[in-house]
């Protein structure tokens, strides 16, 4: 199966590594998603990469484990990531907490917490996002929204502005072609009959259901055809709570 994790490599050659964006969605109203974080990553190979994430505490961002790097800078308060505004806050990451069972080959347990060196200042442009409760098993059929700075089309350059797209939770059978899909710890999201999906650059962004973060964008088929796989946040609340409590 040709899986494609959704982070964005900026300096590699080849079409499979170009920047990406939400497909079939719309531009967010500026600063209507004040918890969104744009992650500027220097990889272990010294490439520049990018992901999405979201602020859950003044000093913690939640994202995907495959967005880990040698160093990460977090941009908060952004709508257009290329046009500086007074709302911007740029903060360095002090420590990256990858889930201890994360497997980069199977792309399971794809979740990471980032502790910031300084606490973010909560403003109209910067805020936190509530998480799904412990073991709150959200059922298939719910309509949710994915948010990120990924591609708007497979062959298009990355979006400068924050995008969002409506995506419906699917039965686990819809993701059976992903051999490592695990229903208890992952969500199968997106109608296979509609070209509305996350793509490169959206990794680590939230899946919002009734204003609550239920998932984290993880991977999709290389051709961008839905459904996509999101990490199921409720499954990891005990681990998240432990990291927050101890740090």
Curated annotation (Swiss-Prot):
Mast cells. It comes from Mus musculus. It is found in: Secreted; Cytoplasmic granule. Its EC number is 3.4.21.39. Major secreted protease of mast cells with suspected roles in vasoactive peptide generation, extracellular matrix degradation, and regulation of gland secretion. The active site is at residues 66, 110, 203. Glycans are attached at residue 80. Residues 22-245 form the Peptidase S1 domain. One of its GO terms (biological process) is proteolysis. This is Chymase. The gene is Cma1.
């Amino acid at each position: 199966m040709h899986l494609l994790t959704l982070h964005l490599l900026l300096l590699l050659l080849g079409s499979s590594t170009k920047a990406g964006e939400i497909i079939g969605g719309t531009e967010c109203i500026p600063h209507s998603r004040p918890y969104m974080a744009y992650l500027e990553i220097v990889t272990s190979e010294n490439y520049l990469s990018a992901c999405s994430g979201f602020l859950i505490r003044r000093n913690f961002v939640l994202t995907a484990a495959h967005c880990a790097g040698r160093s990460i800078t977090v941009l908060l308060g952004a709508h257009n990531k290329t046009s500086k505004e007074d709302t911007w806050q740029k903060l360095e990451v002090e420590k990256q907490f990858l889930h201890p069972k994360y497997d980069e080959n199977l792309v399971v347990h794809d979740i990471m917490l980032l502790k910031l060196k300084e606490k973010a200042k909560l403003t109209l442009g910067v805020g936190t996002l509530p998480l799904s409760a412990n073991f709150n098993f959200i059922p298939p059929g719910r309509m949710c929204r994915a948010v990120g700075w990924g591609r708007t089309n497979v062959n298009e350059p990355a979006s400068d502005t924050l995008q969002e797209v409506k995506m419906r939770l699917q039965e686990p059978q819809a993701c059976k072609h992903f051999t490592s899909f695990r229903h208890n710890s992952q969500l199968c999201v997106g109608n296979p009959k509609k070209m509305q999906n996350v793509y490169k650059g959206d990794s680590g962004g939230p899946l919002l259901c009734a204003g609550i973060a239920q998932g984290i964008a993880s991977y999709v088929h290389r051709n961008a055809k839905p459904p996509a796989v999101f990490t199921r946040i409720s499954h990891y609340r005990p681990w998240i709570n432990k990291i927050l409590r101890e740090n």
